[in-house]
Each structure stands twice: as C-alpha cells, then as structure tokens.
Amino acid sequence: FEYHSSANFRDIHCRGAAVFSYCDFYGRVVFTGARYDAQADFDGITCHAAADFSRCLYRGAANFLTSTYVGPVDFSGSTYLADAHFGDSVYYNRVDFSRCVYRGPAIFSHSLYEGPVRRERCLYDQDADFQACVYRSTVAASHSTYGGSANFLGSVWADETS
C-alpha cells in the first residue's frame, strides 16, 4: 500500500497479527501508543517523512527488517515482550530508541545510521545484536542495561559515542 498523505494509527489495539509490510508512507506516519497482542510486521516499509512508533506495546514479535526511514523516526518508550527485529535497515535521519524495554532478543544488525542515534536508558533482558552496523553520526547509549550478551562485532563508529 502507498499512503500519500499523513497516516494516523495512534492508540490502535490489534488483537490479531498486524501486517504493514512493504507499505510506503509519503507523509508523516503516527503509531504512538499502539498495542499489538500478536506479531506485528513492518518489514520493508519506507517512511519518506517523520515516523512515530513511540510508546507502543508489542506482545508478539515486532519485525521492522529491511526498512528505510528518510525522515526522523521515534521508537522511544516502547516495550517489546518478544523478539524485536530492526536489522538490515537504513536510517537517513535521527532515530530514537531511548527508554525502550526489550524482554526478548533485540536484533539491530547490518543497519546503516546516517543521522544521530539515541539508545539511552534501555533495558535489554536477553541478547542484543548490533553487529556490522555503520554509524555516521553521534550515538548516545548511556545508562542502558544488558541482561544478556551485547554484540557490536564489526560495527563502524564514525563520530562521538557515549
């Protein structure tokens, strides 16, 4: 599907699987406060403007693989009770994952970050995989807690990291 103007899914509650895979959002897209009781698939989405996925609750797996974000994107304050997959994605603007809780494995590997990245005050209960990522701007990841392993193998850091 293509959404040529703003798309507002704020505070939706999906009791079954939610599938937004391969959607193109040309205007601002808002999912703030959404709740997903089953798997949520956003694989392959392209967001050309600002995207807001903040303060969401994912009870099933959350899949954001192979996605492209041209505008700024906000995932802050979200809770992932199962696997969270963000790998193989491209972020051309700032991205905020601050204050997220990951109860299952969190996978961010093989992604490109052109703008600033915030991952402050996150809780990773299980393994977190950031391997082979490229960061071309600042990365702020202070005050985060890792309950499992944190894998940054092969990542490239081009600017200030805290």
Language-model segments: what does each one mean?
Residues 1-162:
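N-terminal leader/targeting and pre-domain segments
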